[in-house]
Amino acid sequence: MSGDFLALAQPGVQQLSPYVPGKPVDELARELDIDPATIVKLASNENPLGASPKALAAIRDELAELTRYPDGNGFALKSLLAERCGVEIDQVTLGNGSNDILELVARAYLAPGLNAVFSEHAFAVYPIVTQAVGAQARVVPAKNWGHDLPAMLKAIDDRTRVVFIANPNNPTGTWFGAEELDEFLQDVPAHVLVVLDEAYIEYAEGSDLPDGLDFLAAYPNLLVSRTFSKAYGLAALRVGYGLSTPVVADVLNRVRQPFNVNSLALAAACAALEDVDYLAESRRLNEAGMQQLEAGFRDLGLRWIPSKGNFIAVDLGREAAPIFQELLREGVIVRPVANYGMPNHLRITIGLPAENTRFLEALAKVLARA
């Protein structure tokens, strides 16, 4: 006789739906029985430029030490991040991707009877980490596909411990300005930790999108999370970080798994931070690709949501799921976002020029026969 181990799980976990990543290239290749090299994947907001050459060299140099555990404190990377970000080293928390930082926050500050506030159309990990610890999710309706910060303020109550906001937001690409952010932070109660998710901040340099680091000193209840998975091109290595007060960083460190960032990731991240030419080329490629996709959508008579990320959400004016499936048959992987409350949209990662062209041609072909 065996127990019902689903029923024995925590109530919040019982109701969870696992995170579904973008469809892997190899999986589609098996399904279609085609060469993986012929498939274009624009689904997971990865950097089409590939990894920094300096990061690859750092990984090669680290291979001889694979029998050793990594530096559990990540001293070299934390020191470099502290210098670059203008903070002290004890304000830096390293994570196995920035998702890890979000989960550490939930484990440390949320529990049954407490709640977290976040926006409609927000990153899927926010509800997952909230529900996993038995806390309540308070979802605030979006405004023009983005965060309605005044409405989010009104949703905060004495049981709120965390507010998740993203700038720019994924999957919509929307953003808010410095004045809006400052007014919001001024009014958030002191007992609420604001997690400002800046996974795509590197793509927004030179725009009107604010830098969360400019607000850290003034607001001790602010944590800024960032990642090396996007503009720095290290998605496979899983390394992210949080910047906060030393007290918050200490609390997160208490629930952090030992050796949560591996040696290859630590070495590659340090090298990637130093490769300013690579980052500049990533931004240039992204800006050109964004313009290419916008022009293509315009030619097809489609609307899209303006984006500050390395992706763009296009409105097909009809249910997107069948179009997504037809694109798969054309060997093109994009991201359906019905699970974000956007059933008529597809989210497209900015790719190389040839990849963008391949997608636009496939989309035109599919729409013509739909």
UniProtKB/Swiss-Prot annotation:
Pathway: Amino-acid biosynthesis; L-histidine biosynthesis; L-histidine from 5-phospho-alpha-D-ribose 1-diphosphate: step 7/9. Belongs to the class-II pyridoxal-phosphate-dependent aminotransferase family. Histidinol-phosphate aminotransferase subfamily. This is Histidinol-phosphate aminotransferase 2. Its EC number is 2.6.1.9. GO terms for molecular function: histidinol-phosphate transaminase activity; pyridoxal phosphate binding. It is an enzyme of class 2 (transferase). InterPro entries: Aminotrans_II_pyridoxalP_BS, Aminotransferase_I/II_large, HisP_aminotrans, HistidinolP_aminotransfase, PyrdxlP-dep_Trfase, PyrdxlP-dep_Trfase_major, PyrdxlP-dep_Trfase_small. It catalyses: L-histidinol phosphate + 2-oxoglutarate = 3-(imidazol-4-yl)-2-oxopropyl phosphate + L-glutamate. HAMAP family: HisC_aminotrans_2. The modification N6-(pyridoxal phosphate)lysine is found at residue 230. Signal peptide: none annotated. Pfam families: Aminotran_1_2. Its cofactor is pyridoxal 5'-phosphate. It comes from Pseudomonas fluorescens (strain ATCC BAA-477 / NRRL B-23932 / Pf-5).
